[in-house]
A protein has these predicted regions:
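Active-site-adjacent structural elements that line small-molecule/cofactor binding pockets in enzymes
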Residues: 1-189
Length: 189
């Protein structure tokens, strides 16, 4: 998902639409090869002709597929095709930009979960939601630390404290307090 990852592997960093189209075909290939019969697909990125993938997965339907992203198209696709949907910053150009940072707010995360819910329809309750935690800090001084973290990310302290991607824990407290943020540690639904 990052341009540096693709550069290090010699891959071309295609535009987001091409990467999403390739992922959709890739998921179709995996699911097809995990099926009981020979599988064929004539796509723009993959061509499979009467291949019966072996060995077959032990788990019916194959292992769970996780698809993560931060944009509407990839999250909507994930909601329709994946078993686990990862809700992440919107990294359009393969770099963590100021816009990507802003897409980690509580409000942006709620909007993304709405896209997933809308696209998933009746299967929403069967999908596992995963949210990337970018910052975990154990401190008794969360307000001061949130100002410092927020300043480095172009966000104010209140936005950092409310963000589901940043969690706060107080040292030497019971475990029930070890994973809560300003919004009570709940993922917005």
């Amino acid at each position: 998902w990052r341009a540096t990852d693709e550069a290090q592997t010699g891959m071309t960093h295609d535009r987001a639409g091409v990467r999403i189209d390739r992922m959709i075909e890739g998921i179709k290939v995996l699911r097809g090869l995990w099926g009981d019969d020979a599988f064929s697909l004539e796509g723009n990125h993959y061509t499979i002709t009467e291949m019966n993938g072996m060995p077959k997965p032990v788990q019916a339907g194959g292992p769970p597929i996780i698809v993560g992203g931060g944009g509407k198209r990839v999250l909507s696709t994930a909601a329709r095709m994946a078993d686990i949907v990862g809700v992440h910053p919107n990294v359009v150009e393969g770099v963590i930009s100021p816009e990507a940072i802003k897409s980690m707010s509580s409000e942006a995360t709620e909007e993304k979960l709405g896209w997933v819910r809308d696209a998933a329809g009746d299967r929403f309750d069967d999908i596992e939601i995963s949210i990337l935690k970018l910052v975990t800090i154990v401190t008794d001084g969360r307000d001061a630390v949130s100002e410092k973290v927020g300043g480095g990310m172009g966000m104010d302290a209140a936005t950092i404290l409310a963000s589901p991607t940043h969690w706060w824990a107080r040292p030497n407290r019971s475990s029930k307090n070890s994973s809560s943020n300003a919004s009570g540690g709940r993922v917005p639904t």
